[in-house]
Amino acid sequence: MTDAPRRRSTPTVPAKAALEGLEDKWGERWEADGTYRFDANAPADAVFSIDTPPPTVSGSLHVGHVFSYTHTDCIARYQRMTGREVFYPMGWDDNGVPTERRVENYYGVRCDPTVHYDAAFVPPEKAPKNRRDFLAVSRRNFIELCVQLTGEDEQVFEALWRRLGLSVDWTQTYTTIDERSRRVSQRAFLDNLARGEAYQADAPSMWDITFRMAVSQAELEDRPRPGAYHDLAFHRSDGEGDLVVSTTRPELVVSCVALVAHPDDERYKPLFGSTVTSPLFGVEVPVVAHRLADPEKGTGAAMICTFGDLTDVIWWRELDLPARAVIGRDGRFAADTPAWIESDTGRNTYEALAGLGVKAAQRTTVELLEASGELLGEPKVIEHPVKFYEKGEAPLEIVQSRQWYIRNGGRDAALAEQLIARGDEVTWHPLYMQTRYTNWIEGLNGDWLISRQRYFGVPIPVWYPVDADGEVNYDAPIAPDAVTLPVDPQSDAPNGYDEAQRGQPNGFVGDPDIMDTWATSSLTPQIAGGWDHDHELWAKVFPMDLRPQAHDIIRTWLFSTMVRSHLAEGTAPWRHAALSGWILDPDRKKMSKSKGNVVVPTELLQQHGSDAVRYWAANGRPGTDTAFDETQMKVGRRLALKVLNASRFVLGFSQRNDQSADGGDDAADQAATGARATPLGADAVTHPIDRAMLAEVAALVETVTAAFEEFDYARALERTEAFFWNFVDVHLELVKTRAYRDDDGSASARASLELALSTLLRLFAPHLPFATEEVWSWWMDGSIHRTGWPTTAELGGAGDGADGELPALAAQVLHEVRRTKTEARTGMRTAVRRLEVSAPPELLDRLETVRGDLVDAGVVQEFEMTPTDAGADLTVSVELVVDDA
């Protein structure tokens, strides 16, 4: 909840204002006062809940993080000032591959589940340069190192967020590997399993040979890589010559199960139903037809191998072909010769490939094909997109493996349509981002693969029975009771068994895999919102009001959260989704730790100050990629400093007046009458230019409020900043002399300036929280961030009916005076001997109301107004006093 502005009787304005030290001063005060603490007793309709993205804990934050999290914070601060009780938690995404890789490199260790736990283990003092020399440690020791290092990283992250001024409630935190997250993640998975939404399948899956794990479609990325088309001769079984295919993966000829062409391709229609034998190995395979074959690609005929790419998987499934895989999970060709190679020549040939990695096997295969005469012509060099795991270093392979999946519409058109419709329940900022969400769903080719063959993550919470012959029955998973969660099947025994039965006949085995980190991150609303332990809180915060995130993870975090909410709650998980763009380096490439082109924000915050860095970030429009530009931080620092100094100037009028009332030259008279300074209100604003300025302030409030209601923090800042500079450069200069006086005109100037300052500070507060809080403390009680958002009603109608064009007319005259002095290379306090304004009488009548202010601001000795014909332009003539010296 918020309070109305409470002005103290006399401002306390410092002799000099500075930005240095404000972060520490106000950060400590906000924490001590609980300024941003969420009130769980607030009614549900007063709550504004944010599904804060938990940053990945795998090193350090970069300016891209500062960029997007500032956007969220601006929105949170605005909502809090409008009276909403803001639920703004912070999580840390500390499990998964990035964390494991950081721990491996930091300590020089690698996880080996066959190694026994060492309770006294101490990691090496220095990590070896070569990963092959990393020390093998037990799974438990490895997890302990992960917990230790991520805990240290999280403290650094929190310190940076606090310095940036994020108005997070730091009592509402979690990590994606803590007990609460593991319990929520496992319970949600078991609910999916009970409803038939989670299932296990032994099927082809994308496989990263470096990390030795399966990956999902959402984690794939195409990278351009050199390659070559090789024309291979398959021999027709009828002896009528060869059928030539072009392939970029000649090494997979050993895994070929068929040749395929488009059913309408006249070249191959006579061959459909016939067979050919493969080069080198002499394996007979059929020639088949399928609509996905491209007549324009290569020779129009292609190998179906198990498995070269995802199209191979489709062909294999739909044409019911056999599986003949030779590439193992280690990325090497099988050591044993496959049974389907029956000829002695073929078996001898395979011995040259056994145990080789994919690249070596390709080179060897090409050499063998050249020697056999079955490679036709020279390879045609190309560059083509190759599938990689987004965090991987080697091209993905497709291997057969048993994995867990959650249904996501990739194989269910009805579910896909339901998820697309859920997108309509969300207001997208910017709107076009919904198209990316829809396009992703429409492009899915399978369900969500959630199991990972790694160590630091939430364990798949099931066991499998072992029969009397020692065979594992994967079709009858044993689930734990909900009250026992979280569990680790690698160290806990299922109900009804004891540890001695692990791996024994009539015993059990635990599922060795963990869940993909997105499987847990997809439940951030449930984790933060108390889904399984605080039902009253959950009812208040869900569906959440806002999901802020980067646009590149729509396919992962946003979509996966939508899937889990749709399946469990039957609703979209949020009302709004605000998408931030990327930060680009000077080469217009996305900044990322993996690319090594990031800028660490710590030094920027120290050099420019937090408000300046926030200013740079808040200028990035929603959904738009933005180039890193340190010069904008310098502009932001100048703005924050101007806010301090302009506020000192404005409050100096009131301080001077108030101190005079309390004990100035007329102190005796005032003491006798009991007179004291009293804050001036809107009713004191009587001067036409002051009223016109407040009319502009009222319009600004409406514009900025509308921008924030549309989650457009950038437009809100842009409009506020533009008005502020005009306010200090023109209006303040115009009225300052009048404000120093002691008459009705002075009261009008001071009252209007205070009203404008109070409003502008609050409009700036979401973007510049430290400078605005500092100024607010000089003359107002309480925190500006718990004070109500400005409204036009606060202005008391002072601007109603004001001459809206008067400020621009006065500014035009003042501009000409300043321009003349600048061109004459003289100071602004140089006197003007004669100022003449020529304009139609109607304009002159309006300018007459600000004659005194123009004379004071321009240091004018003689001011003449010359009427012209109606419709003529306003012209200004300036004659300066000549310095005879």
Label the predicted regions.
Residues 42-44, 53-54, 89-100, 173-181, ...:
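Short, solvent-exposed turn/loop segments enriched in Gly/Ser/Thr/Pro and often Arg
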Residues 237-301, 309-314:
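Protease-associated
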